[in-house]
Swiss-Prot record:
Organ and tissue specificity: Expressed by the venom gland.
GO cellular component terms given for this protein: extracellular region
Function: Reversibly blocks Kv11/ERG potassium channels.
Any single Pfam family the record assigns to this protein: Toxin_17
Entry keyword annotation includes Ribosomal protein: no
Notes on the domains: The presence of a 'disulfide through disulfide knot' structurally defines this protein as a knottin.
Disulfide bond sites: C5-C23, C11-C34, C20-C39, C24-C41
Protein's recorded name: Potassium channel toxin gamma-KTx 4.5
Record-stated family: Belongs to the ergtoxin family. Gamma-KTx 4 subfamily.
Gene3D superfamilies from the UniProt entry: Knottin, scorpion toxin-like
Species of provenance: Centruroides exilicauda
Length: 43
């Protein structure tokens, strides 16, 4: 789910990150980006 995207993320500090995007889409959101080492989903 969406929380697992954020909780498991240890991603690049800035910008688009593929795994966040994929995980967020599976959780039902449009896309995901990485901000300050955490995934952020876009509803």
């Amino acid at each position: 789910d969406r929380d697992s995207c954020v909780d498991k993320s240890q991603c690049a500090k800035y910008g688009y990150y593929y795994q966040c995007d994929e995980c967020c889409k599976k959780a039902g959101d449009r896309a995901g980006t990485c901000e300050y080492f955490k995934c952020k989903c876009n509803p």
